[in-house]
Every structure is written in C-alpha cells, then in structure tokens.
From Swiss-Prot:
Disulfide bonds: none annotated. The keyword Phosphoprotein does not apply. It comes from Cereibacter sphaeroides (strain KD131 / KCTC 12085) (Rhodobacter sphaeroides). Pfam families: UreF (PF01730). This is Urease accessory protein UreF. The gene is ureF. It is found in: Cytoplasm. HAMAP family: UreF. GO terms for cellular component: cytoplasm.
Length: 210
C-alpha cells in the first residue's frame, strides 16, 4: 500500500477530527418517525442518499476538485446544492475541520470549504486514481450513517456491518460513474432524505446535529 493511499485512509477514518459522528444527515428524524426501523430499511435509506442525494453530488464535486476545477466555483455550487440549513452546516463545518487538520499535518494552505471540495484540494497532490478516492469517500460517508443507525435504531454491530457490506457494489458503481461525469450532470433527487433533513431542524429531542 502506498503512502498516498495511507494518507487518504487516515483522512477518511472515523478517528480524523471532522466531527462526522455528530451528523446523521437527517437519518435521526427518519428513525424517530419509524421510516427507518431495522437493518433493511436503514440500508435502503442510505442507498437512496448515496445514489440520488449527497453521495452522488459530493462524488462529482470531489472528482472535479481532484482535477483542479476552480475551488471557489465548486464551493459555491456545493453550498447551493445543500437542501437545508443543517445540511449546509454539515458540509461546511466538516470541511473546515478537515482542512484545518490536514493543513496542520502538511503545512499546506487549505482554506475552509465544503467537505467534498476541501477533500479534493487536499487529495489532489496524492495522485491517486479519481474513482478510488471517490469510492473511499463514499464508503466513509455510508459507514458514518450506518454507525448512526447502529446507535439510534438501534442495530446490532453485525447487522450494521452487513448493511455496510451490502452497499459496497453501489459505492463502486457510483464512484466509477461520478469519476467521469461532467459537472452539469450534478443533481439530487433524494426527496425523503432532504425532507428528513429539513424536519430535523425543528425536532425537539435529538442527539445529532443534523
């Protein structure tokens, strides 16, 4: 395994201080309303977000950031794609924490930007295949949502890992497609996930930020 790949794995690890564990992407509301109630429904909900929501849009943004597209233009697009105030906060807060930590580790100047753009800027010099970077990012995103489901549904640890493993083919497919997608192919249709994120903003009792 190359040093570059090890760096990327470290940056996308749950131990990396982006605070990802505190964000459920609206999943907490879906669980509280009974839409997600077991491993099968959790897997379907996460699969929809990956294929039709932030998973795909972030993957396309990341691919273009890796290829040196104007980071400010990508950051503006990432903000515009956030369907709710909490989703915007989720990508901006994690992106800022990610950039600050990588900058401290590497000495590079990495301004705070939405997470997929910040990750793309940081990872571009690693020279890794674009689809590989996208797949690892999508896996980290899915793993964080599975972890939220394990804690809040709750699911057993083995159930959670089985759900994550079942998402691997979809992650590979989205990564391969997004690596070649033009920027104007970006778009979202994960309507239930977006509504969940909006309704989470007024949820009275909650343990996640989003």
């Amino acid at each position: 395994m190359s040093a570059a790949l090890l760096s990327l794995v470290q940056w996308l690890s749950p131990a990396f201080p982006t605070g990802a564990f505190a964000y459920s992407h609206g999943l907490e509301w879906a669980i509280s309303e009974g839409e997600v109630r077991d491993a099968a429904s959790a897997r379907r909900w996460i699969a929809d977000v990956l294929a039709f929501g932030a998973g795909r849009t972030d993957a396309i943004l990341l691919a273009h950031a890796l290829r040196g597209h104007d980071p400010e233009a990508l950051a503006d697009l990432a903000r515009a794609l956030a369907p709710s105030a909490e989703r915007l906060r989720e990508t901006e807060e994690q992106g800022a924490a990610f950039a600050a930590t990588v900058a401290a580790l590497t000495g590079r100047d990495l301004p705070p930007r939405p997470l997929p753009v910040a990750l793309g800027q940081a990872a571009a010099p690693l020279g890794l295949p674009v689809a590989e970077v996208l797949a690892l990012m999508l896996h980290a995103f899915a793993a964080n949502l599975v972890s939220a489901a394990v804690r809040f549904v709750p699911l057993g640890q083995t159930e959670g890992q089985a759900a994550l493993a079942a998402l691997h083919p979809l992650i590979e497919e989205i990564a391969a497609e997004s690596a070649e997608a033009p920027l104007d192919a970006i778009g979202s249709a994960a309507l239930r996930g977006d509504l969940a994120a909006m309704r989470h903003e007024t949820q009275e009792v909650r343990i996640f930020k989003t």
